[in-house]
Regions:
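Small/aliphatic-rich secondary-structure junction motif
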Residues: 1-57, 136, 146, 154-222
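Generic structural signal for helix capping and beta-alpha/helix-loop junctions
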Residues: 43, 96-98, 121, 151, ...
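A short acidic, glycine-rich active-site loop
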Residues: 55-70
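Short histidine/acidic/glycine/proline-rich micro-motifs that form metal-
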Residues: 12-13, 62, 92-95, 118-120, ...
Length: 279
């Protein structure tokens, strides 16, 4: 595809499926896999009684450090027999510093591989890791469902969600290595307005751009016959046999941080296939 540095972030034991998928993708891409093991201190020292904060703070940091070191040891043992190039690093952060720590790693990765941040199997810090990778790190992220994914064949049939936004176009450009290698790419345009800049040819300019890159692209104009765009896209993915969705990641502001907007969260909560997103 063209992704030569792949990053995955592990924050708790048991994220085996995510690590295995990242390994398989690195092997397929002949990429270097960077694994970042993070111990997160969730304590709020401001709530401790006077005189105890310094001791309790250090105790909490020590616990997080021990957890990070244990994660690193476990990951190294799992990667030792693998025939890929890999590196593992561990670090500790308080919850408020996770975003900066993750963003520093994500900004130099070609692709970040993470598990779905919602549902009973999600790691407690998964949403914060995803938001930091996307919005502060500026990296494209492949979000995997909790079920096993056949990474070796991933991206044969790709559904692209197109709504003329800057975010969608940026995601598509970051996904070009996937799209160029795919057997079929379908540009899904849901309920387009006849008064939009694309007028009577929704998706036409995008299809032309992709075709010039050698992408085997078609357009599907879909009526919004279900309550949400997410449901329309998921139904189309099932009908077309798509094994990956490419879409823009939309954000809203929370103080100085960007967090996922409702539409992006809604899709990730309900997606049954891998989603490659960027902003």
């Amino acid at each position: 595809m063209g992704y030569k540095t792949i990053l995955t972030v592990i924050t708790q034991a048991g994220q085996t499926a995510q690590l295995e998928a990242a390994v398989a993708l690195a092997r397929r891409e002949d990429a270097h896999l960077e694994v970042f093991a993070v111990g997160v201190d969730h304590t709020q020292t401001g709530y401790y009684y006077a005189g105890a904060s310094a001791y309790v703070f250090q105790e909490a940091i020590d616990r997080a450090m021990a957890a990070a070191e244990a994660l690193e040891t476990e990951i190294r043992a799992e990667l030792a027999p693998e025939d890929i190039r890999w590196s593992v690093e561990s670090a500790v952060a308080q919850m408020g510093g996770v975003s900066t720590l993750i963003a520093m790693r994500a900004r130099f990765a070609d692709l970040v591989v993470l598990a779905k941040p919602y549902g009973p199997k999600a790691a407690p810090d998964a949403e914060a890791v995803l938001e930091a990778s996307l919005f502060e790190g500026g990296a494209p992220v492949l979000v995997l469902p909790h079920e096993n994914v056949a990474v070796e064949t991933l991206g044969k049939r790709v559904l692209v969600a197109w709504n003329q936004s800057d975010e969608a176009l940026h995601a598509i450009r970051r996904a070009l290595p996937v799209l160029k290698a795919a057997e079929a790419v379908e540009i899904a345009v849901v309920d387009p307005s006849p008064y939009s800049p694309e007028g009577s040819d929704p998706g036409g300019k995008l299809c032309q751009m992709l075709t010039r890159h050698g992408v085997k692209a078609d357009i599907a104009v879909l009526a919004k016959t279900l309550p949400t765009v997410t449901e329309v896209l998921n139904r189309r993915a099932a009908e077309s046999g798509a094994d990956m969705l490419v879409m823009g990641a939309y954000s809203k502001s929370r103080l100085r941080e960007a967090i996922m907007g409702g539409a992006t969260r809604h899709m990730l909560e309900r997606a049954t296939l891998p989603v490659l997103m960027a902003r």
